[in-house]
Amino acid sequence: MKRTYQPSTVRRKRTHGFRARMKTKAGRAVINARRAKGRARLAV
């Protein structure tokens, strides 16, 4: 059986990257929440 997680840097950046987050209102909320919490890494 093939595993579900087949890592791809491109897909990872496109779906969870900083620019992808900034595109939507909800994504910006995620970034702001992580900033408020003091996360060292805001996005992938």
From Swiss-Prot:
**Pfam name, any one:** Ribosomal_L34
Q: Name one GO cellular component term.
A: ribonucleoprotein complex
Please list the GO terms describing molecular function: structural constituent of ribosome
**What InterPro entries would the database entry show?**
Ribosomal_bL34, Ribosomal_bL34_CS
Indicate yes or no for the key word Ribosomal protein.
yes
Which biological processes are named by the entry's GO terms?
Answer: translation
Signal peptide segment: none
Q: Which UniProt keywords apply?
A: Ribonucleoprotein, Ribosomal protein
Alphabetized HAMAP family for the sequence: Ribosomal_bL34 (MF_00391)
Similarity comment: Belongs to the bacterial ribosomal protein bL34 family.
Task: From the Swiss-Prot or TrEMBL record, give the protein name.
Answer: Large ribosomal subunit protein bL34
- Organism in which the protein naturally occurs: Thiobacillus denitrificans (strain ATCC 25259 / T1)
Give the gene that encodes this protein: rpmH
